[in-house]
Amino acid sequence: MDFETNEDINGVRFTWNVFPSTRSDANSNVVPVGCLYTPLKEYDELNVAPYNPVVCSGPHCKSILNPYCVIDPRNSSWSCPICNSRNHLPPQYTNLSQENMPLELQSTTIEYITNKPVTVPPIFFFVVDLTSETENLDSLKESIITSLSLLPPNALIGLITYGNVVQLHDLSSETIDRCNVFRGDREYQLEALTEMLTGQKPTGPGGAASHLPNAMNKVTPFSLNRFFLPLEQVEFKLNQLLENLSPDQWSVPAGHRPLRATGSALNIASLLLQGCYKNIPARIILFASGPGTVAPGLIVNSELKDPLRSHHDIDSDHAQHYKKACKFYNQIAQRVAANGHTVDIFAGCYDQIGMSEMKQLTDSTGGVLLLTDAFSTAIFKQSYLRLFAKDEEGYLKMAFNGNMAVKTSKDLKVQGLIGHASAVKKTDANNISESEIGIGATSTWKMASLSPYHSYAIFFEIANTAANSNPMMSAPGSADRPHLAYTQFITTYQHSSGTNRIRVTTVANQLLPFGTPAIAASFDQEAAAVLMARIAVHKAETDDGADVIRWLDRTLIKLCQKYADYNKDDPQSFRLAPNFSLYPQFTYYLRRSQFLSVFNNSPDETAFYRHIFTREDTTNSLIMIQPTLTSFSMEDDPQPVLLDSISVKPNTILLLDTFFFILIYHGEQIAQWRKAGYQDDPQYADFKALLEEPKLEAAELLVDRFPLPRFIDTEAGGSQARFLLSKLNPSDNYQDMARGGSTIVLTDDVSLQNFMTHLQQVAVSGQA
């Protein structure tokens, strides 16, 4: 099975598809054994089983029956490839044959619809910032009201609005608009909040109100769950309430920012859900119009003379409030993730709102982080509504309360995960590595929210430390069978249809001695580039940017020294196999990307870009690392061209896709013809068609992209042409003469050609 087919069917893509047989050999490979896995990958031929799975009874195993199991029909038993335990088959599996084979023995990926009941529908808790301009707030209200029509009628809804104070709206009151008002400058605790809202002190463990009405009980005028009511019951009142919202009336002195209690609002929202809906699917959806200016969670002082922190301020420890704000929001993130709740953050302003400090709220829960200039923009409106996209059966594509366990045979141990999840530390698994990459020290992770587009990077360590085992031998009695390492991904989650489901993917990879040609041939350079990029982005959160780039360079050099063909000290002899040849190029563009080169970005922009990158699959991640460039001309059909300054020509139109924005660039000659209006003359219909062609292709790219990319239409000499030029390899820069009508790029960045020349020189010299 090739890389793409495995990804389409199983949602998994490995860096190496044949593993080295020992740990030391794997370490010599430089690029770690790992995979990019999309648990809820959409697949038309996915088998869905309407029953509970058959689970292995082996200690510390709990893996699920799969096609790699050895079935013994005579004894009605099966052997688990993960732990080699023998298990009895249930009575309904007694008459197995080639014609009568259950779905789980036919498919490496299967989904079970279990009989575990769903007791409470999902909860959507809107947290709205009122310190906004009227036009911006009106657009936001319109989008929220539209989104209500996309939610299940039985979904529970809550509403908080805030400015200088936090207002918790009581939707149970039919006759009047009633809300509880809290101080914006106070960090409330669950006990105090519960007592204020119910009149009773909580006495249960962990601050839970054990004697109070809980999520399962009837809503009463004094119960904590009165703030969350079914949409079908409160839709009219909620729409009326939203329509009547107006900007915060608190006066803002000249030279000051509005007083904005974002931290307190999020704290109250998370505590309220913990108090009555712990481990029940819930989303806190925050709409922020600016930075928090009130502690707790203060991002910047209200005086405009105090600027928002920059990357330089953070790196030099001059960001006065940064560490304290990070600590506050990280505490909320830990609470929310532990309770199975999700936080989505939508920013609608030109200013930074503090995404850099708040990023753990979304990154640890699978929530959305979206940075836009205003709530009136198409990017916000369409991206927000795409959050509530539905499948062919009319159910929301979002899934809730996910939990993913990775089971491995004794050949592998799990090092960690990089993606939007949090660790489940209480686990009896025995396949956990002592060395960690990303979120480690566990083989089980919690995903409060996940979707068909959430992908996770998972890293493995070869467990075998000795080279004395025969890698061609597997279990006793299998002399001719290759030695396989088995991995099973078990993802439990709540489907939006109101059912509990389990998605199971089982894969097998051969283990061979180091130096075997099959190992090199199994290298997936695209998956490897994305997984190494995720490690680099993860390192960049704590390490110096220059150190991360040096680490990338060292790993690239070592990989080339290991797998390139060359004569020592002869750069001209350097050759890479086709499945390695693009990897240096990916590394070059990654070094220049906004994920690692943050010079021209704000901390919020960096948090946003890294958030999106660490959730996407291989294809989309590669577009972010190395954008695609397509050329349109009168002479040729549309064709992909090099991401290089030599591709910019006067008589072509270029379409650039960076994932975050899509740009159409008209060459100098094309731009002149367009300004002259030739496209309006019927005799130049071909020119008109040429102008329309990139627009049609751009529209196709926009259909399913989340978040919606920014669209830029520019031309040679235009102010926004810089967005294209900044992404190009500067093979023609101001130090050289432009060739063949190509464009000169004003930059001091090293070109790809010089990068490759230097790589070859260092690799063949034996340096690292």
From Swiss-Prot:
How would you describe this protein's topology in the membrane? Peripheral membrane protein
Q: Name one GO molecular function term.
A: GTPase activator activity
Q: Which CDD domains does the UniProt entry name for this protein?
A: Sec23-like, Sec23_C
One GO BP annotation here?
macroautophagy
Posttranslational modification: Ubiquitinated. Ubiquitination is required for the formation of the SEC23/24 complex. Deubiquitinated by the UBP3/BRE5 complex.
Q: Which parts of the sequence carry N-acetylmethionine?
A: M1
Query: Which residues of the sequence carry a binding annotation for Zn(2+)?
Result: C56, C61, C80, C83
Which Gene3D superfamilies does the entry mention? beta-sandwich domain of Sec23/24, Sec23/Sec24 helical domain, Severin, von Willebrand factor, type A domain, Zn-finger domain of Sec23/24
Any single GO CC term annotated in Swiss-Prot or TrEMBL for this entry: endoplasmic reticulum membrane
Q: How does it assemble?
A: The COPII coat is composed of at least 7 proteins: the SEC23/24 complex, the SEC13/31 complex, SFB2, SFB3 and the protein SAR1. Forms two other heterodimeric complexes with SFB3 and PDR17. Interacts with BET1, BET3, BOS1, EMP24, GRH1, SEC16, SEC22 and SYS1.
Q: Name the PANTHER family on file.
A: PROTEIN TRANSPORT PROTEIN SEC23
| Function of the protein | Component of the coat protein complex II (COPII) which promotes the formation of transport vesicles from the endoplasmic reticulum (ER). The coat has two main functions, the physical deformation of the endoplasmic reticulum membrane into vesicles and the selection of cargo molecules. SEC23 interacts with BET3 in order to target TRAPPI complex to COPII involved in internalization of plasma membrane proteins like the maltose transporter.
Per the record, the similarity remark reads: Belongs to the SEC23/SEC24 family. SEC23 subfamily.
* Listed name of the protein: Protein transport protein SEC23
Q: Which organism is it from?
A: Saccharomyces cerevisiae (strain ATCC 204508 / S288c) (Baker's yeast)
Q: What is the lineage of its organism?
A: Eukaryota, Fungi, Dikarya, Ascomycota, Saccharomycotina
Q: Which gene encodes it?
A: SEC23
